[in-house]
């Protein structure tokens, strides 16, 4: 047998990571109960009969607020570890964080001027 310099472990893990979901999905498909009537395909809403259609159109403002929220939520996720380790990182990390915050402030000003934060 020849030596792959440790790549056989990576290949083994890749194979295992590929086989486990395939086996789990196959087992669930084999073991699940089949059949069921038309009631099984209806929407369940707190035990009440659904009223109206499921295809309603949401206002685009909800999506704009959600996108702005996600952007600044990700900003918080990136800035929190930096703030925790601030005393050990030094001046270069401080300057990098300031550049990151400046880019996000520019994005906030852009969204504000485009009217993404207004509900009217």
Swiss-Prot record:
The EC number(s) this enzyme carries: 7.1.1.-
GO molecular function: NADH dehydrogenase (ubiquinone) activity; quinone binding
GO cellular component, one term: NADH dehydrogenase complex
Domain of life: Bacteria
Pfam families reported in the protein's UniProt record: Oxidored_q4
Reaction catalysed by this enzyme: a plastoquinone + NADH + (n+1) H(+)(in) = a plastoquinol + NAD(+) + n H(+)(out); a plastoquinone + NADPH + (n+1) H(+)(in) = a plastoquinol + NADP(+) + n H(+)(out)
Localization terms from the record: Cellular thylakoid membrane
Principal cellular location given in the protein's record: membrane
InterPro entries: NAD(P)H_OxRDtase_bac/plastid, NADH_UbQ/plastoQ_OxRdtase_su3, NDAH_ubi_oxred_su3_sf
GO terms of biological process kind: photosynthesis, light reaction
UniProt entry keywords in alphabetical sequence: Membrane, NAD, NADP, Plastoquinone, Quinone, Thylakoid, Translocase, Transmembrane, Transmembrane helix, Transport
Protein topology in the membrane: Multi-pass membrane protein
Gene3D superfamilies: NADH:ubiquinone/plastoquinone oxidoreductase, chain 3 (1.20.58.1610)
Segments passing through the bilayer: 7-27, 64-84, 89-109
EC class of the enzyme, as a word: translocase
Role noted for this protein: NDH-1 shuttles electrons from an unknown electron donor, via FMN and iron-sulfur (Fe-S) centers, to quinones in the respiratory and/or the photosynthetic chain. The immediate electron acceptor for the enzyme in this species is believed to be plastoquinone. Couples the redox reaction to proton translocation, and thus conserves the redox energy in a proton gradient. Cyanobacterial NDH-1 also plays a role in inorganic carbon-concentration.
PANTHER family recorded: NADH-UBIQUINONE OXIDOREDUCTASE CHAIN 3
Family that this chain belongs to: Belongs to the complex I subunit 3 family.
Quaternary structure note: NDH-1 can be composed of about 15 different subunits; different subcomplexes with different compositions have been identified which probably have different functions.
Record protein name field: NAD(P)H-quinone oxidoreductase subunit 3
């Amino acid at each position: 047998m020849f030596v792959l310099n440790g790549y056989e472990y990576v290949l083994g893990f890749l194979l295992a990571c590929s086989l486990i979901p395939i086996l789990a999905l196959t087992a669930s498909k084999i073991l699940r109960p089949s059949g069921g009537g038309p009631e099984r395909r209806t929407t369940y809403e707190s035990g009440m009969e659904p009223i109206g259609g499921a295809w309603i159109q949401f206002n685009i403002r909800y999506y704009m607020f959600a996108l702005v929220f996600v952007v600044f939520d990700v900003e918080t996720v990136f800035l929190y570890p930096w703030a925790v380790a601030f005393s050990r990182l030094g001046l270069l990390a401080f300057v990098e964080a300031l550049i990151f915050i400046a880019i996000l402030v520019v994005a906030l000003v852009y969204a504000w001027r485009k009217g993404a934060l207004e509900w009217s």
